[in-house]
């Protein structure tokens, strides 16, 4: 995960810079006698420092390439003419054969061949038509059950994490590579608080269970605890964002800067944390509160996770054992349990229920980086990986998963709803899919040229009790999105 802000913008600027300095060559159909004129035309306006001999050699090579393409084009035209002639001849011969008397063997052979062709044609047509009907039905159903409600736009770089407060008023928090964390009004999409205390990418954000305090992890090798006070604005009527099936077209190259105003420029700013946790020697990739909110855990690229006392900022435990960088950490909602994920293809369960000793269990089952592992209500852990799978584990039987979900793209920071235990999967390929704990696919969030994410989706977060939006997603297209998932209808379609 990049630690410097502007990483996506820098990549775009570099790409544009390379494009502006690329050699411009005009397409022309010219003979050998026209080559000097062609050379002059191609070199017009070019501020080249190459010697004349080198330029002439390059132009001659380009000329040879052009001639080869011309020859291929002519050969292609000739082949097309021959194919058309053969098709016409076959049509005439087929009509003549149909009018002639055939022997029993010939008739059997022809009938078998014709039947096979007809069967194959019908099969292909039926399969394509059925696929379109099913795809259209699924799209319509998903759109009715999963509706986009609000876009949260204001960051200047990609978003790594999204979270919802557990206290009133309920607000949305986002962590971005632009070195800031923002708090948003869920109803209006207005930025309420801007935190600028970090000197690196803000990689995660989590809220205190009982107070208006946030915990953020950063690429500056620290985690910050900071207080916020928000007053919600009056919600305004929102326009209908639903689209018809005919408009469900993927314009994936649409620039993420389109309509991208600086919504955070006029919101109150918090610059100094209450405390900073500074024991790591590498990027702090994630952080979370232990139950009760008196301790916090952090995960770092230095291959360790640290447990801190929030009041004193003192390091209580350093959790070692992972062989590679950590990618995520998560705490149990009601027990003193922590799960850490790593690039070493494992995740580990740390038990702090006994103050005198903490135990650790290693979960092995993935073949690539474990991007996140989260607790569910009960005795389950759900893990997601770059190996394109999600696995559901029973804490009482850690040898093998009880369910495996196989997908077509790497999975990032997953979220499991509390009530119905629905797993939300954010993908590298810009999709967000919903599954149940048995691995049954429930829905795919709609995505088109008018709505949805246009870049990698990094994180999902459920907020089931909110009346407007009960699922949030964020991605590297610099925006967070609030969705309304009709959970009863979703489960009824199961």
Swiss-Prot record:
A Pfam family per the record: WD40
Localization terms from the record: Cytoplasm; Nucleus
Biased composition (Acidic residues): 245-263
Alphabetical UniProt keywords: Cytoplasm, Nucleus, Repeat, WD repeat
Gene3D superfamilies in UniProt: YVTN repeat-like/Quinoprotein amine dehydrogenase (2.130.10.10)
Keyword set includes Nucleus: yes
Protein name stated in the entry: WD repeat-containing protein 37
Natural source organism: Xenopus tropicalis (Western clawed frog)
Organism ancestry: Eukaryota, Metazoa, Chordata, Craniata, Vertebrata
């Amino acid at each position: 995960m990049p630690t410097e802000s502007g990483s996506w913008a820098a990549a775009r600027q570099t790409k544009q810079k390379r494009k502006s300095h690329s050699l411009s060559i005009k397409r022309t159909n010219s003979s050998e006698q026209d080559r000097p004129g062609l050379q002059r035309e191609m070199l017009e306006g070019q501020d080249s420092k190459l010697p004349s001999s080198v330029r002439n050699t390059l132009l001659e090579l380009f000329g040879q390439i052009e001639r080869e393409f011309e020859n291929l084009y002519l050969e292609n035209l000739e082949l097309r003419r021959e194919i058309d002639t053969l098709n016409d001849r076959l049509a005439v011969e087929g009509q003549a054969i149909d009018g002639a008397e055939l022997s029993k063997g010939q008739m059997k052979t022809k009938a078998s061949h014709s039947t096979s062709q007809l069967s194959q044609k019908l099969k292909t047509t039926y399969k394509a038509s059925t696929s379109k009907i099913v795809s259209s039905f699924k799209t319509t159903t998903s759109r009715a059950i999963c509706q986009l409600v609000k876009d949260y736009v204001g960051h200047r770089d990609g978003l790594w994490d999204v979270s919802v407060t557990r206290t009133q008023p309920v607000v949305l928090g986002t962590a971005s590579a632009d070195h800031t964390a923002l708090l948003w009004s869920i109803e209006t999409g207005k930025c309420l608080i801007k935190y600028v205390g970090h000197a690196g990418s803000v990689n995660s954000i989590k809220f205190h269970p009982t107070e208006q305090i946030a915990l953020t992890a950063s690429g500056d090798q620290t985690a910050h605890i900071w207080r916020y006070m928000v007053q919600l604005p009056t919600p305004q009527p929102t326009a209908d964002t639903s689209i018809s099936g005919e408009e469900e077209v993927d314009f994936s190259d649409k620039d993420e800067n389109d309509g991208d105003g600086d919504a955070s420029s006029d919101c109150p700013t918090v610059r100094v944390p209450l405390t900073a946790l500074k024991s790591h020697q590498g990027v702090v990739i994630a952080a979370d509160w232990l139950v009760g909110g008196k301790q916090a855990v952090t995960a770092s690229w230095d291959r360790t996770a640290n447990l801190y006392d929030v009041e004193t900022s003192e390091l209580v435990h350093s959790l070692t054992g992972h062989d590679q960088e950590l990618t995520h950490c998560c705490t149990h909602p009601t027990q003193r349990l922590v799960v850490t994920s790593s690039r070493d293809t494992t995740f580990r369960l740390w038990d702090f229920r006994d103050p005198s000793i903490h135990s650790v269990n290693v979960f092995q089952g993935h073949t690539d980086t474990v991007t996140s592992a989260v607790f569910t209500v009960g005795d389950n852990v759900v893990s997601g990986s770059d190996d394109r799978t999600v696995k559901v584990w029973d804490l009482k039987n850690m040898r093998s998963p009880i369910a495996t979900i196989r997908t077509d793209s790497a999975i990032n920071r997953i979220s499991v709803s509390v009530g119905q235990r629905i797993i939300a999967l954010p993908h590298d390929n810009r999709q967000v899919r919903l599954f149940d704990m048995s691995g049954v696919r429930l829905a795919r969030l709609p995505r088109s040229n008018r709505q949805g994410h246009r870049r990698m989706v990094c994180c999902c977060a459920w907020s089931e009790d909110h009346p407007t939006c009960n699922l949030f997603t964020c991605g590297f297209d610099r925006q967070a999105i609030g969705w309304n998932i009709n959970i009863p209808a979703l489960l009824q379609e199961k």
